[in-house]
Amino acid sequence: MALRTIRVEGDPVLGKVCREVTEVTPKIVTLIDDMLETMYEANGVGLAAPQVGILKRIVVIDVGEGPIVMINPEIIESDGEQTGDEGCLSVPGKAGQVTRPNYVKARFMGEDMNEYEIEGEELLARCICHELDHLDGHLYVEKVEGALHDVTYEDTQE
């Protein structure tokens, strides 16, 4: 496993639509392992492949209940609404108010290329929506209500 460089706002790769994964090769397995290591090292709860410069439809998420690896994910159901502060490893030191669904159901492939579904509420729902936006070339700052504000590492540890 290796740490990968996280691309930041302004990098053209973050504005591109990612390609579907058709098979899990050793390179894809290494990418997933590297993404998890990079996410944990950066104290993030989610990371999408384009954030490390790879235009593949892969996200990793861990909101405190263990890692979730999603290949070719899509949201198939959503409900409710939540508004809260959101940040991004690709927009360091900033956060802003974003409204997202309070509940989502997503379908995805696992590393075994079998199909799975996951249901999430609150933080997990927010994270799934946020990471899937990356796969279509969108950053959360496009959805911010009001202005971005500065955050420090200490703010994120509360």
Swiss-Prot record:
It comes from the Bacteria. Its EC number is 3.5.1.88. InterPro entries: Peptide_deformylase, Peptide_deformylase_sf. The keyword Lyase does not apply. The active site is at 131. GO terms for molecular function: metal ion binding; peptide deformylase activity. Binds 1 Fe(2+) ion. GO terms for biological process: co-translational protein modification; translation. The keyword Iron-sulfur does not apply. It catalyses: N-terminal N-formyl-L-methionyl-[peptide] + H2O = N-terminal L-methionyl-[peptide] + formate. Its cofactor is Fe(2+). Keywords: Hydrolase, Iron, Metal-binding, Protein biosynthesis. Fe cation binds at residues 88, 130, 134. PANTHER family: PEPTIDE DEFORMYLASE (PTHR10458:SF22). Removes the formyl group from the N-terminal Met of newly synthesized proteins. Requires at least a dipeptide for an efficient rate of reaction. N-terminal L-methionine is a prerequisite for activity but the enzyme has broad specificity at other positions. Belongs to the polypeptide deformylase family. This is Peptide deformylase. It comes from Agathobacter rectalis (strain ATCC 33656 / DSM 3377 / JCM 17463 / KCTC 5835 / VPI 0990). The lineage of its organism: Bacteria, Bacillati, Bacillota, Clostridia, Lachnospirales. The gene is def.
